Amino acid sequence: MIKVSDAAAKQIAISVEQMGENKMPLRVAIKVNEDGSFHYNMGFDDRNLDGDKTFEEKHIPFVVDAASIALITGMTLDYVEIDGKHEIVFLNPNDPNYKAPTES
């Protein structure tokens, strides 16, 4: 399903601890825009909706809606520094705008 880098797993664990969201899974969803581009959503969510798929990666519980399952397969969450700012990024080879990361 989703791969999680060590850096992203560490940052998610920090967020869980700060927010006290110990048992809530992390919901990941993708909306395909009219132009075919992907819009990503991610947040803690304790709802269990019809068609949801749940799984665990690096001790992080995830939930994905049925429409996003095929779109997230093979995706990696990473935590990187971009222009001096740290953020979680979605590295998704299924995304039409995906560019493989390069070392700088």
Where would I find each of the regions flagged by the language model?
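A domain-level signal for the structural core that forms small-molecule/cofactor-binding pockets
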Residues: 3-9, 37-50, 55, 96-98, ...
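Generic detector of bulky aromatic hydrophobic side chains
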Residues: 11-14, 31, 39, 63, ...
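Flexible, active-site-adjacent loop/turn segments at secondary-structure boundaries
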Residues: 2, 42, 69-70, 88
